[in-house]
Swiss-Prot record:
It holds the Pfam family bHLH_HIF1A. Residues 398-441 form the PAC domain. Residues 601-622 have a biased composition (Basic residues). Detected exclusively in adult brain in inhibitory interneurons. Residues 60-71 are annotated as: DNA-binding. SMART domains: HLH (SM00353), PAS (SM00091). GO terms for cellular component: nucleus. This is Neuronal PAS domain-containing protein 3. May play a broad role in neurogenesis. May control regulatory pathways relevant to schizophrenia and to psychotic illness. It is found in: Nucleus. The lineage of its organism: Eukaryota, Metazoa, Chordata, Craniata, Vertebrata. One of its GO terms (molecular function) is protein heterodimerization activity. Residues 152-222, 324-394 form the PAS domain.
Length: 925
């Protein structure tokens, strides 16, 4: 029963049955491991459930499915987020999650940077959605509007492609909020890699402090010192060392607050990592490129408008330009540029010849000088900072600066500098300084630097000196280099001593007289070589301002030189010339030698004329010299007596600063007197002021100091008769002296400058006393000029008589004579005391054919015409005419000869009549 029940229930009733039952169950459901089975003890027996492995597998499957689902959703969201980034799909599809998050954060910060900054960068493309209720036909836009929209959609990329660099924006922590994809062109780095990263990860450790300062931050203590203290070699490999750890900039006590005194503009140089650099190319750091950062700090929009609070800095927006590689063979040579090589102190050691194409400087002018010598004073500080950047980083680009010109003005220039090392000698370093011209010369001939001041007067005097040497090379053996050096020395000394001319004037008087006496004894008329050495301005003391005594003041860059034609070949010698002393009291000492030989007296006369020229003409060459005051009460018209032997053709030269072609083939020599003078057969220099003695017969003659750039007018001096010298005739001059009057009534007198002042000297034939100050009037322009010509003195171009002699007359002046009046323009004012001119005398007509007239019978007709054309007023030596007699002359000043060649031919002169002292004016021809 029990067996049957047991069998019917299927449960074993004994041990044997239980064992067989278990074996049968195991065969049907094999268990991999006994431990995986659980035995559950119950009151009715023991049984085994399904394996734990199956349950675990199901759980794992569900977990994997859930994780896969979550990852899919996450990836989908990241993918959707990446598509929102302003990046190409080819880039966003390959971004990892961290990059997507980093770029997203940077983009969000960038939008805040744009919208919250001052001024806000509102996107033009953003706006309310189009009004869909409006019909499509009404919403249709014009083709131009569509074109503008398409263009603006790609405007950013066009701008980036046009830039010779890349753009990036940093926040106040120094992280890249944005950087353009063009950074890969210049640094080889990826835009995705840099965006959201710290700028200090890519900046040279030596530039961390500067970068932090530009952002208004400071580095942790010791971090900047560590970077700055490294050597160049250590800094080159710092990216792989512990120093290259990204410094965490800490904000300052007032972190991003900018005072009103600070500027927002930024311009500096840093070195950034680059994968495009060649090994060994960069001098200061390998693996880095020098980047020029120019930008502006961006401020946050102030929240309170009622009060002024310091604005908070949000970051920095910059344009970065990678400097050209330091190898000079990779620099493109443009048309408006020139290259110089300088040493580490910016001392120029080489310059291209192309510099002369753009400015008035030559390589000779700048080689050996420092660049700072040619930089405008306001730009020196900027160049100094660029110099420091160059020494620290190896490359730099200067700001726009002004390069000073030689004769005034400047040119705007920008330079790119690179340190180059000699491959053969590593210790030999120099700088390749490439200059790019940005403008044409500005403010020409306007001195803006003290270095430009000496060149302006030298430019005017160089032309006259050059013409002097050219004339001497034709007429004489020439002027030595010592003479030229003495001229330049005198110019410098004169400019230095021009402020106090009186002491130097006294010195020059004694020194000149001593030299004159020495030359009288030591030189003979037969030694032209020895006289050549004296035919210059010998001492700088003679060049000091003395317009109050021996000239017309500062007379501009021109001078008149009077030459005499003679008839004898033996007279072709140059008389000794010296500078003119201003003290005529000492000149009168030589008047006691009236009975000396004619050659000796003529030498003295020429020396004094040279002094006259040296005293006044040299002052004209220096425009900086001011005209000293003049004691008008001591103005005296000088006169000189000469023998009839000296009657010859005067050659008056007007030197002009501007170069003029005066070749013999030039049309200007076709004028009759010039045509005669152009024959260099018998040149004779009358550049010395005449003495108080007789005119000697010319023994030694030579070429004048005058040059080719002069207007030559032949004036026979025998027709220039002297002014009367009675008791009321005129004032004493340095040329009057006490010499006896020669018997020849037609010996030409000398009327010196009306501004000459001499306390000593006797009267003329009329015996004027020392106190004689009676003034006579000129009858016109010609009379004044003739008397000055007769005195062989330098005379200015008379424009108008507008006032008394002013001590401050510094206007640029030109000079001319009656022969050059039709060529030289009137530009100066001759100020006479009380609008008076030197003494004049009534016309006393003479026979031009008489022996006393002093003319060679073979004189050309045109010479005689010009000779008589200037006669107009001079009377015999012995005749003394009062001032009242001038009123008897005809207003037209037409004259004829008494019995001569032109007895029936009237010749008008330049005068417009006689004017009273109150209304006398100079008329411009």
């Amino acid at each position: 029963m029990g067996r049957a029940g047991a069998a019917a229930n299927g449960t074993p009733q004994n041990v044997q049955g239980i064992t067989s039952y278990q074996q049968r169950i195991t065969a049907q459901h094999p268990l991999p491991n006994q431990s995986e089975c659980r035995k559950i003890y119950r009151y009715d027996g023991i049984y085994c459930e399904s394996t734990y492995q199956n349950l675990q597998a199901l759980r794992k499957e569900k977990s994997r499915d859930a994780a896969r689902s979550r990852r899919g959703k996450e990836n989908f969201e990241f993918y959707e987020l990446a598509k929102l980034l302003p990046l190409p799909a080819a880039i966003t599809s390959q971004l990892d999650k961290a990059s997507i998050i980093r770029l997203t954060i940077s983009y969000l910060k960038m939008r805040d940077f744009a919208n919250q900054g001052d001024p806000p960068w509102n996107l033009r493309m953003e706006g309310p959605p189009p009004n869909t209720s409006v019909k499509g036909a009404q919403r249709r836009r014009s083709p131009s509007a569509l074109a503008i929209e398409v263009f603006e959609a790609h405007l950013g990329s066009h701008i980036l492609q046009s830039l010779d660099g890349f753009v990036f924006a940093l926040n106040q922590e120094g992280k890249f909020l944005y950087i353009s994809e063009t950074v890969s062109i210049y640094l080889g780095l990826s835009q995705v890699e840099l965006t959201g990263s710290s700028v200090f990860d890519y900046v040279h450790p030596g530039d961390h402090v500067e970068m932090a300062e530009q952002l208004g931050m400071k580095l942790p203590p010791g971090r900047g010192l560590l970077s700055q203290g490294t050597t160049e070699d250590a800094a080159s490999s710092a990216s792989s060392s512990s120093q290259s750890e990204t410094p965490e900039p800490v904000e300052t006590t007032s972190p991003s607050l900018l005072t009103t005194d600070n500027t927002l503009e930024r311009s500096f140089f840093i070195r950034m990592k680059s994968t495009l650099t060649k090994r060994g190319v960069h001098i200061k750091s390998s693996g880095y490129k020098v980047i020029h950062i120019t930008g502006r700090l961006r401020l946050r929009v102030p929240l309170s408008h009622g009060r002024t609070v310091p604005s908070q800095i949000m970051g920095l927006v910059v344009v970065a330009h990678a400097l050209p590689p330091p190898t000079i063979n990779e620099v493109r040579i443009d048309c408006h540029m020139f290259v110089t090589r300088v040493n580490m102190d910016l001392n120029i050691i080489y310059c291209e010849n192309r510099i002369s194409d753009y400015m008035d400087l030559t390589p000779v002018d700048i080689v050996g000088k420092r660049c700072y010598h040619f930089i405008h004073a306001e730009d020196v500080e900027g160049i100094r900072h660029s110099h420091l950047d160059l020494l620290n980083k190896g490359q730099c680009v200067t700001k726009y600066y002004r390069w000073m010109q030689k004769n005034g003005g400047y040119i705007w220039i920008q330079s790119s500098a690179t340190i180059a090392i000699n491959a053969k000698n590593a210790n030999e370093k120099n700088i390749i300084w490439v200059n790019y011209l940005l403008s044409n010369p500005e403010y020409k001939d306007t001195p803006m630097d003290i270095a430009q001041l000496p060149h302006l007067p030298e430019k005017a005097s160089e032309s006259s000196e050059t013409s002097d040497s050219e004339s001497d090379s034709k007429d004489t053996s020439g002027i030595t280099e010592d003479n030229e050096n003495s001229k330049s020395d005198e110019k410098g000394n004169q400019s230095e001593n021009s402020e106090d001319p009186e002491p130097d004037r006294k010195k020059s008087g004694s020194a000149c007289d001593n030299d004159m006496n020495c030359n009288d004894d030591g030189h003979s008329s037969s030694n032209p070589d020895s006289r050549d050495s004296d035919d210059s301005f010998e001492h700088s003391d003679f060049e000091h301002p003395k317009a109050a005594e021996d000239g017309f003041g500062a007379l501009g860059p021109m001078q008149i030189k009077v030459e005499r034609y003679v008839e004898s070949e033996a007279d072709l010698r140059l008389q000794p010339c010296e500078s003119l002393t201003s003290d005529s009291a000492k000149d009168s000492d030589s008047a006691n030698e009236a009975g000396a030989q004619a050659s000796s007296k003529h030498q003295k006369r020429k020396r004094r004329r040279k002094r006259q020229k040296g005293g006044s003409a040299s002052r004209r060459r220096l425009s900086s010299a001011s005209s000293p005051g003049l004691d008008a009460g001591l103005v005296e018209p000088p006169r000189l007596l000469s023998s009839p032997h000296s009657a010859s053709v005067l050659k008056i030269k007007t030197e002009i600063a501007e170069p003029i072609n005066f070749d013999n083939e030039s049309s200007i020599w076709n004028y009759p007197p010039n045509r005669e003078i152009s024959r260099n057969e018998s040149p004779y220099s009358m550049t010395k002021p005449p003495t108080s003695e007789h005119f000697p017969s010319p023994q030694g003659q030579g070429g004048s100091i005058g040059g080719g750039g002069a207007l030559h007018v032949a004036i026979p001096d025998s027709v220039l008769t002297p002014p009367g010298a009675d008791g009321t005739a005129g004032r004493k001059t340095q040329f009057s002296g006490t010499a006896p009057v020669p018997s020849d009534p037609l010996s030409p007198p000398l009327s010196a400058s009306p501004r000459d002042k001499h306390p000593g000297g006797g009267a003329g034939s009329g015996g004027g006393g020392p106190g004689a100050s009676n003034s006579l009037l000129y009858t016109g322009d010609l009379e004044a000029l003739q008397r000055l010509q007769a005195g062989n003195v330098v005379l200015p171009l008379v424009h108008r008589v507008t006032g008394t002699l002013a001590a401050t007359s510094t206007a640029a002046q030109r000079v001319y004579t009656t022969g050059t009046i039709r060529y030289a323009p009137a530009e100066v004012t001759l100020a006479m005391q009380g609008n008076l001119l030197p003494n004049a005398h009534a016309v006393n007509f003479v026979d031009v054919n008489s022996p006393g007239f002093g003319l060679d019978p073979k004189t050309p007709m045109e010479m005689l015409y010009h000779h008589v054309h200037r006669l107009n007023m001079s009377g015999p030596f012995g005749g003394a005419v009062s001032a009242a007699s001038l009123t008897q002359m005809p207003g037209g000043n037409v004259f004829t000869t008494a019995e001569g060649l032109f007895s029936t031919l009237p010749f008008p002169v330049y005068s417009n009549g006689i004017h009273a002292a109150q209304t006398l004016e100079r008329k411009e021809d």
